């Protein structure tokens, strides 16, 4: 395991547990991620927790059980998110499915000199950007969950 910092997006938790790496099959993966949370290497913003709270499923239950996973939107995170939105206002949207959590997930990684982990895929344009598009433009490292697992050197 590395001592790199990772900021998890909603999609990494939700899609990770629901679709990609179900805990009924990949139980040890989630134990490893829980260890990374306990070690302070994985965090998410409380805006992600609010988004997950609207659900009634395994992802919500697991996230709620991770006491150290979510961090409040402290001033440096808010300031960084404001800078992100000044450059990329279309990262969030009142209509459609773009999440208000996205700039804060990126801001957390920026403030902690870390990497974003998301299951969003880049659109390849900044007109209607997703997390990987904005990360690429701002020079913030961004991985999907499989790439995160590989970066840890974990094998199963």
Summary of predicted features, one role per range:
Residues 2, 26, 122-156:
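Acidic, PIN/NYN-like endoribonuclease modules and their adjacent C-terminal/linker elements
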